[in-house]
From Swiss-Prot:
Subcellular location(s) of the protein: Cytoplasm
Residues that bind ATP: K203, E325, G351, G352, D353, T354
Family stated for the protein in its record: Belongs to the phosphoglycerate kinase family.
Pfam families: PGK
Catalyzed reaction equations: (2R)-3-phosphoglycerate + ATP = (2R)-3-phospho-glyceroyl phosphate + ADP
Organism: Bordetella parapertussis (strain 12822 / ATCC BAA-587 / NCTC 13253)
InterPro entries linked: Phosphoglycerate_kinase, Phosphoglycerate_kinase_CS, Phosphoglycerate_kinase_N, Phosphoglycerate_kinase_sf
Biochemical pathway: Carbohydrate degradation; glycolysis; pyruvate from D-glyceraldehyde 3-phosphate: step 2/5
Name listed for the protein in its UniProt record: Phosphoglycerate kinase
UniProt gene name: pgk
Molecular-function GO term, any one: ADP binding
GO cellular component: cytosol
Length: 397
Protein backbone atom coordinates (compact mmCIF):
# COMPACT_ATOMS: atom_id res chain seq x y z
CA UNK A 1 0.00 0.00 0.00
CA UNK A 2 2.58 2.48 1.10
CA UNK A 3 5.36 2.10 -1.52
CA UNK A 4 8.22 3.08 0.80
CA UNK A 5 11.71 1.62 1.15
CA UNK A 6 11.94 -0.67 4.19
CA UNK A 7 14.70 -1.53 6.62
CA UNK A 8 13.82 -5.23 6.32
CA UNK A 9 14.35 -5.19 2.53
CA UNK A 10 17.67 -3.31 2.87
CA UNK A 11 18.86 -5.71 5.59
CA UNK A 12 18.00 -8.73 3.41
CA UNK A 13 19.96 -7.29 0.48
CA UNK A 14 23.12 -7.07 2.63
CA UNK A 15 23.46 -3.38 1.80
CA UNK A 16 23.77 -2.27 5.42
CA UNK A 17 26.97 -3.86 6.70
CA UNK A 18 29.25 -1.32 8.39
CA UNK A 19 26.82 1.55 7.71
CA UNK A 20 25.67 4.14 10.24
CA UNK A 21 21.91 4.02 10.82
CA UNK A 22 19.77 6.67 12.53
CA UNK A 23 16.49 5.26 13.89
CA UNK A 24 13.69 7.63 14.92
CA UNK A 25 11.71 5.52 17.39
CA UNK A 26 8.74 6.40 19.61
CA UNK A 27 10.01 5.85 23.17
CA UNK A 28 7.65 8.41 24.73
CA UNK A 29 6.66 6.26 27.74
CA UNK A 30 4.81 7.22 30.94
CA UNK A 31 6.61 7.53 34.30
CA UNK A 32 5.34 7.09 37.88
CA UNK A 33 5.84 9.65 40.66
CA UNK A 34 9.17 8.08 41.61
CA UNK A 35 10.49 8.65 38.09
CA UNK A 36 10.30 4.99 37.07
CA UNK A 37 8.91 3.84 33.71
CA UNK A 38 5.35 2.70 34.45
CA UNK A 39 4.53 1.11 31.07
CA UNK A 40 7.17 0.08 28.51
CA UNK A 41 5.14 -1.15 25.48
CA UNK A 42 6.66 1.46 23.16
CA UNK A 43 10.22 0.58 24.18
CA UNK A 44 9.55 -3.14 23.60
CA UNK A 45 7.93 -2.32 20.25
CA UNK A 46 11.14 -0.56 19.10
CA UNK A 47 13.41 -3.56 19.76
CA UNK A 48 12.79 -5.54 16.50
CA UNK A 49 13.88 -2.57 14.37
CA UNK A 50 17.04 -2.02 16.45
CA UNK A 51 17.87 -5.76 16.33
CA UNK A 52 17.36 -5.84 12.57
CA UNK A 53 19.93 -3.04 12.15
CA UNK A 54 22.37 -4.65 14.61
CA UNK A 55 22.15 -8.06 12.94
CA UNK A 56 22.84 -6.40 9.58
CA UNK A 57 26.16 -5.16 10.99
CA UNK A 58 25.27 -1.50 11.41
CA UNK A 59 26.39 1.15 13.87
CA UNK A 60 23.05 2.11 15.43
CA UNK A 61 21.88 5.51 16.69
CA UNK A 62 18.36 5.73 18.15
CA UNK A 63 16.46 8.83 19.21
CA UNK A 64 12.95 9.76 20.36
CA UNK A 65 11.03 12.59 21.95
CA UNK A 66 9.91 12.34 25.57
CA UNK A 67 7.20 14.66 26.87
CA UNK A 68 7.17 18.30 25.80
CA UNK A 69 10.46 19.87 26.87
CA UNK A 70 11.44 23.44 26.10
CA UNK A 71 13.78 23.46 23.09
CA UNK A 72 17.34 24.23 24.12
CA UNK A 73 16.57 23.74 27.83
CA UNK A 74 16.31 20.04 28.74
CA UNK A 75 15.78 19.22 32.42
CA UNK A 76 16.50 15.93 34.19
CA UNK A 77 12.80 15.03 33.92
CA UNK A 78 13.07 15.26 30.11
CA UNK A 79 16.01 12.85 29.90
CA UNK A 80 15.89 9.50 28.11
CA UNK A 81 18.32 8.05 30.74
CA UNK A 82 15.73 5.60 32.20
CA UNK A 83 14.83 4.56 28.64
CA UNK A 84 18.51 3.83 27.86
CA UNK A 85 18.63 1.60 30.93
CA UNK A 86 15.46 -0.30 29.94
CA UNK A 87 16.69 -0.64 26.36
CA UNK A 88 20.00 -2.08 27.66
CA UNK A 89 18.03 -4.73 29.60
CA UNK A 90 15.84 -5.62 26.61
CA UNK A 91 18.75 -5.83 24.15
CA UNK A 92 21.11 -7.55 26.60
CA UNK A 93 23.87 -5.02 25.86
CA UNK A 94 24.93 -1.60 27.06
CA UNK A 95 23.12 1.31 25.41
CA UNK A 96 25.05 4.53 25.97
CA UNK A 97 23.10 7.81 26.30
CA UNK A 98 24.66 10.61 24.21
CA UNK A 99 23.70 14.11 25.44
CA UNK A 100 24.81 16.69 22.83
CA UNK A 101 24.77 14.82 19.57
CA UNK A 102 23.76 17.07 16.69
CA UNK A 103 27.36 17.96 15.71
CA UNK A 104 28.69 14.40 15.76
CA UNK A 105 28.33 10.94 17.33
CA UNK A 106 30.99 8.26 17.73
CA UNK A 107 29.43 4.80 17.35
CA UNK A 108 30.93 1.53 16.09
CA UNK A 109 29.28 -1.26 14.04
CA UNK A 110 27.53 -3.64 16.45
CA UNK A 111 27.00 -0.85 19.00
CA UNK A 112 23.75 0.96 19.93
CA UNK A 113 23.65 4.48 21.35
CA UNK A 114 20.58 6.44 22.44
CA UNK A 115 20.65 10.10 21.41
CA UNK A 116 19.11 12.34 24.09
CA UNK A 117 15.53 13.65 23.72
CA UNK A 118 15.32 15.06 20.18
CA UNK A 119 12.80 17.71 21.21
CA UNK A 120 15.57 19.40 23.20
CA UNK A 121 17.17 20.50 19.92
CA UNK A 122 16.31 24.02 18.79
CA UNK A 123 14.38 23.77 15.52
CA UNK A 124 13.05 20.20 15.99
CA UNK A 125 9.36 21.07 16.11
CA UNK A 126 9.62 23.62 13.29
CA UNK A 127 11.25 21.02 11.00
CA UNK A 128 14.22 23.39 10.63
CA UNK A 129 16.24 22.69 7.48
CA UNK A 130 19.65 23.49 9.01
CA UNK A 131 19.05 21.08 11.90
CA UNK A 132 17.66 18.43 9.53
CA UNK A 133 20.76 18.60 7.29
CA UNK A 134 23.09 18.30 10.31
CA UNK A 135 21.25 15.21 11.55
CA UNK A 136 21.18 13.67 8.07
CA UNK A 137 24.99 14.06 7.93
CA UNK A 138 25.30 11.74 10.95
CA UNK A 139 24.06 8.69 9.07
CA UNK A 140 24.15 6.59 5.89
CA UNK A 141 20.60 5.32 6.43
CA UNK A 142 17.65 7.03 8.14
CA UNK A 143 14.89 4.79 9.53
CA UNK A 144 11.50 6.03 10.74
CA UNK A 145 9.98 3.48 13.11
CA UNK A 146 7.67 5.90 14.96
CA UNK A 147 4.13 5.72 13.59
CA UNK A 148 2.86 7.61 16.66
CA UNK A 149 4.51 10.81 15.39
CA UNK A 150 3.93 10.24 11.64
CA UNK A 151 1.35 13.04 11.52
CA UNK A 152 3.93 15.62 12.63
CA UNK A 153 6.42 17.25 10.26
CA UNK A 154 9.40 17.68 12.60
CA UNK A 155 13.14 17.54 11.98
CA UNK A 156 13.56 13.90 13.13
CA UNK A 157 10.36 12.64 11.47
CA UNK A 158 10.38 14.61 8.21
CA UNK A 159 13.31 16.97 7.56
CA UNK A 160 16.09 14.42 8.07
CA UNK A 161 14.33 12.02 5.67
CA UNK A 162 14.67 14.60 2.88
CA UNK A 163 18.46 14.82 3.20
CA UNK A 164 19.73 11.43 4.47
CA UNK A 165 21.48 9.33 1.75
CA UNK A 166 18.81 6.61 2.20
CA UNK A 167 15.44 6.95 3.99
CA UNK A 168 13.23 3.99 4.88
CA UNK A 169 10.52 2.64 7.20
CA UNK A 170 11.33 0.38 10.15
CA UNK A 171 9.37 -2.84 10.83
CA UNK A 172 6.88 -1.19 13.22
CA UNK A 173 5.96 1.57 10.75
CA UNK A 174 5.87 -0.97 7.91
CA UNK A 175 3.41 -3.22 9.80
CA UNK A 176 1.25 -0.25 10.75
CA UNK A 177 0.98 1.02 7.16
CA UNK A 178 0.21 -2.48 5.91
CA UNK A 179 -2.58 -2.97 8.48
CA UNK A 180 -4.12 0.45 7.84
CA UNK A 181 -3.95 -0.09 4.09
CA UNK A 182 -5.61 -3.46 4.45
CA UNK A 183 -8.41 -1.90 6.51
CA UNK A 184 -9.14 1.19 4.43
CA UNK A 185 -7.65 0.97 0.94
CA UNK A 186 -8.61 -2.57 0.04
CA UNK A 187 -11.01 -3.81 2.73
CA UNK A 188 -12.88 -7.08 2.72
CA UNK A 189 -16.59 -6.14 2.95
CA UNK A 190 -18.74 -5.45 4.86
CA UNK A 191 -16.50 -2.72 6.32
CA UNK A 192 -17.68 -1.59 9.77
CA UNK A 193 -16.26 1.40 11.67
CA UNK A 194 -16.88 2.15 15.34
CA UNK A 195 -16.27 5.77 16.35
CA UNK A 196 -16.78 6.56 20.02
CA UNK A 197 -15.89 9.57 22.11
CA UNK A 198 -17.59 12.51 23.72
CA UNK A 199 -17.71 15.05 20.89
CA UNK A 200 -18.88 14.99 17.29
CA UNK A 201 -16.93 18.22 16.69
CA UNK A 202 -13.53 16.60 17.37
CA UNK A 203 -14.29 13.58 15.16
CA UNK A 204 -16.50 15.22 12.53
CA UNK A 205 -13.93 15.00 9.71
CA UNK A 206 -13.38 11.30 10.53
CA UNK A 207 -17.13 10.63 10.48
CA UNK A 208 -17.47 12.46 7.15
CA UNK A 209 -14.49 10.64 5.62
CA UNK A 210 -15.75 7.21 6.80
CA UNK A 211 -19.32 7.94 5.64
CA UNK A 212 -18.04 7.64 2.05
CA UNK A 213 -16.30 4.31 2.65
CA UNK A 214 -17.94 2.09 5.26
CA UNK A 215 -21.02 -0.15 5.15
CA UNK A 216 -21.94 0.42 8.81
CA UNK A 217 -20.85 3.41 10.90
CA UNK A 218 -21.36 2.63 14.59
CA UNK A 219 -21.27 5.72 16.83
CA UNK A 220 -20.77 5.55 20.60
CA UNK A 221 -20.51 7.73 23.71
CA UNK A 222 -21.48 11.42 23.51
CA UNK A 223 -21.26 11.18 19.71
CA UNK A 224 -24.14 8.66 19.71
CA UNK A 225 -26.25 11.05 21.83
CA UNK A 226 -25.87 13.77 19.19
CA UNK A 227 -26.88 11.26 16.48
CA UNK A 228 -29.92 10.24 18.59
CA UNK A 229 -30.92 13.92 18.74
CA UNK A 230 -30.53 14.06 14.95
CA UNK A 231 -32.86 11.06 14.68
CA UNK A 232 -35.49 12.89 16.78
CA UNK A 233 -35.01 10.85 19.97
CA UNK A 234 -35.04 12.33 23.51
CA UNK A 235 -31.67 12.31 25.32
CA UNK A 236 -32.54 14.06 28.62
CA UNK A 237 -29.51 15.78 30.14
CA UNK A 238 -26.99 13.54 28.35
CA UNK A 239 -23.70 14.89 27.02
CA UNK A 240 -24.34 16.01 23.43
CA UNK A 241 -23.74 18.85 20.96
CA UNK A 242 -27.06 20.22 19.65
CA UNK A 243 -25.12 22.56 17.33
CA UNK A 244 -23.72 19.48 15.51
CA UNK A 245 -27.13 17.90 14.80
CA UNK A 246 -27.18 19.11 11.18
CA UNK A 247 -23.74 17.59 10.57
CA UNK A 248 -24.88 14.32 12.13
CA UNK A 249 -27.97 14.33 9.87
CA UNK A 250 -25.74 14.93 6.85
CA UNK A 251 -23.59 11.89 7.76
CA UNK A 252 -26.74 9.73 8.15
CA UNK A 253 -27.95 11.02 4.77
CA UNK A 254 -24.65 10.28 2.94
CA UNK A 255 -24.72 6.74 4.35
CA UNK A 256 -28.38 6.24 3.40
CA UNK A 257 -27.79 7.35 -0.21
CA UNK A 258 -25.06 4.71 -0.50
CA UNK A 259 -27.32 2.01 0.92
CA UNK A 260 -25.19 2.04 4.10
CA UNK A 261 -26.30 2.69 7.68
CA UNK A 262 -25.61 4.44 10.98
CA UNK A 263 -27.30 2.07 13.49
CA UNK A 264 -29.03 4.36 16.04
CA UNK A 265 -29.51 2.82 19.54
CA UNK A 266 -33.00 1.42 20.21
CA UNK A 267 -32.37 0.99 23.95
CA UNK A 268 -29.95 2.68 26.35
CA UNK A 269 -28.62 2.50 29.92
CA UNK A 270 -29.42 5.67 31.90
CA UNK A 271 -28.65 7.16 35.30
CA UNK A 272 -29.75 10.28 37.16
CA UNK A 273 -26.12 11.21 37.95
CA UNK A 274 -22.61 10.46 36.70
CA UNK A 275 -20.39 8.38 38.98
CA UNK A 276 -19.11 4.98 40.06
CA UNK A 277 -22.11 4.51 42.38
CA UNK A 278 -24.85 5.80 40.02
CA UNK A 279 -27.79 3.40 39.66
CA UNK A 280 -28.20 2.09 36.10
CA UNK A 281 -31.60 1.67 34.40
CA UNK A 282 -32.24 0.14 30.96
CA UNK A 283 -34.82 2.04 28.88
CA UNK A 284 -36.16 2.07 25.34
CA UNK A 285 -34.49 4.96 23.48
CA UNK A 286 -37.88 6.68 23.03
CA UNK A 287 -38.53 6.63 26.82
CA UNK A 288 -35.53 8.64 28.06
CA UNK A 289 -36.72 11.17 30.69
CA UNK A 290 -35.66 14.81 30.96
CA UNK A 291 -33.43 14.16 33.99
CA UNK A 292 -31.79 11.03 32.52
CA UNK A 293 -28.17 10.75 31.39
CA UNK A 294 -27.41 8.10 28.76
CA UNK A 295 -24.16 6.37 29.78
CA UNK A 296 -24.21 3.17 27.70
CA UNK A 297 -26.08 1.37 24.92
CA UNK A 298 -28.77 -1.09 26.03
CA UNK A 299 -28.57 -4.91 25.70
CA UNK A 300 -30.80 -5.02 22.60
CA UNK A 301 -28.62 -2.46 20.77
CA UNK A 302 -25.43 -4.21 21.96
CA UNK A 303 -26.69 -7.52 20.55
CA UNK A 304 -27.56 -5.90 17.23
CA UNK A 305 -24.06 -4.39 17.00
CA UNK A 306 -22.53 -7.77 17.93
CA UNK A 307 -24.40 -9.39 15.02
CA UNK A 308 -23.15 -6.67 12.63
CA UNK A 309 -19.55 -7.09 13.87
CA UNK A 310 -19.58 -10.88 13.69
CA UNK A 311 -20.60 -10.68 10.02
CA UNK A 312 -18.01 -7.99 9.17
CA UNK A 313 -15.15 -8.55 6.74
CA UNK A 314 -13.16 -5.62 8.17
CA UNK A 315 -13.55 -3.64 11.42
CA UNK A 316 -11.97 -0.28 12.32
CA UNK A 317 -12.41 0.49 16.03
CA UNK A 318 -11.78 3.87 17.62
CA UNK A 319 -13.48 4.56 20.94
CA UNK A 320 -15.79 2.83 23.45
CA UNK A 321 -19.60 2.91 23.20
CA UNK A 322 -20.25 3.74 26.86
CA UNK A 323 -18.61 4.86 30.12
CA UNK A 324 -16.84 1.49 30.47
CA UNK A 325 -14.71 2.71 33.41
CA UNK A 326 -17.82 2.13 35.57
CA UNK A 327 -18.92 -1.52 35.46
CA UNK A 328 -22.65 -0.78 35.38
CA UNK A 329 -22.11 1.19 32.13
CA UNK A 330 -19.52 -1.19 30.63
CA UNK A 331 -21.77 -3.90 29.20
CA UNK A 332 -22.11 -2.31 25.74
CA UNK A 333 -18.36 -1.85 25.28
CA UNK A 334 -17.69 -5.38 26.55
CA UNK A 335 -20.22 -6.93 24.12
CA UNK A 336 -18.72 -4.93 21.24
CA UNK A 337 -15.15 -5.88 22.27
CA UNK A 338 -16.00 -9.59 22.52
CA UNK A 339 -17.85 -9.50 19.17
CA UNK A 340 -14.74 -8.00 17.55
CA UNK A 341 -12.63 -10.73 19.18
CA UNK A 342 -15.02 -13.42 17.84
CA UNK A 343 -15.34 -11.93 14.35
CA UNK A 344 -13.61 -13.76 11.50
CA UNK A 345 -13.00 -10.36 9.86
CA UNK A 346 -9.76 -8.36 10.05
CA UNK A 347 -9.85 -5.76 12.85
CA UNK A 348 -7.67 -2.74 13.55
CA UNK A 349 -8.03 -0.75 16.77
CA UNK A 350 -6.45 2.51 17.92
CA UNK A 351 -6.75 5.37 20.40
CA UNK A 352 -6.06 5.45 24.14
CA UNK A 353 -9.54 4.55 25.43
CA UNK A 354 -9.84 1.75 22.89
CA UNK A 355 -6.54 0.24 24.05
CA UNK A 356 -7.75 0.48 27.67
CA UNK A 357 -10.92 -1.44 26.72
CA UNK A 358 -8.87 -4.09 24.89
CA UNK A 359 -6.70 -4.51 28.01
CA UNK A 360 -9.73 -4.59 30.35
CA UNK A 361 -11.39 -7.43 28.41
CA UNK A 362 -8.14 -9.25 27.55
CA UNK A 363 -8.75 -9.42 23.79
CA UNK A 364 -5.37 -8.15 22.50
CA UNK A 365 -4.53 -11.53 20.94
CA UNK A 366 -7.87 -11.66 19.12
CA UNK A 367 -7.62 -8.14 17.69
CA UNK A 368 -6.13 -8.19 14.18
CA UNK A 369 -3.87 -5.17 14.66
CA UNK A 370 -3.51 -2.69 17.51
CA UNK A 371 -2.28 0.69 16.27
CA UNK A 372 0.48 2.40 18.26
CA UNK A 373 -0.48 5.87 17.02
CA UNK A 374 -3.19 8.00 18.61
CA UNK A 375 -3.24 11.20 16.55
CA UNK A 376 -1.60 9.55 13.53
CA UNK A 377 -4.23 6.78 13.52
CA UNK A 378 -7.03 9.36 13.58
CA UNK A 379 -5.49 11.46 10.80
CA UNK A 380 -5.11 8.33 8.67
CA UNK A 381 -8.82 7.58 9.22
CA UNK A 382 -9.59 11.14 8.08
CA UNK A 383 -7.83 10.38 4.83
CA UNK A 384 -5.08 12.93 5.51
CA UNK A 385 -1.54 12.43 4.22
CA UNK A 386 0.92 11.77 7.05
CA UNK A 387 4.03 13.97 6.50
CA UNK A 388 6.51 11.38 7.83
CA UNK A 389 5.09 8.75 5.47
CA UNK A 390 4.72 11.11 2.50
CA UNK A 391 8.44 12.01 2.62
CA UNK A 392 9.42 8.30 2.63
CA UNK A 393 7.12 7.73 -0.36
CA UNK A 394 8.71 10.67 -2.19
CA UNK A 395 12.21 9.30 -1.49
CA UNK A 396 11.21 5.84 -2.76
CA UNK A 397 9.67 7.19 -5.98
Amino acid sequence: MSNVNTLSALAKSGALSGKRVFIRADLNVPFDDAGRISEDTRIRASVPGIRLALDAGEAVMVTSHLGRPKEGALTEADSLAPVAQRLSELLGMQVRLVPDWVDGVSVEPGEVVLLENCRGNVGEKKDDEGLSRKMAALCDVYVNDAFGTAHRAEATTHGIARFAPVACAGPLLEAELEALGRALHDPKRPLVAIVGGSKVSTKLSILQSLADKVDQLVVGGGIANTFMLAAGLPIGKSLAEPEQVEQARAVIEIMKRRGAEVPIPTDVVCAKSFGADAAATVKAAADVAEDDMILDIGPQTAQRLADILKAAGTIVWNGPVGVFEFDQFAHGTEVVARAIADSAGFSIAGGGDTLAAIAKYGIADQTGYISTGGGAFLEFLEGKALPAVAVLQARAA
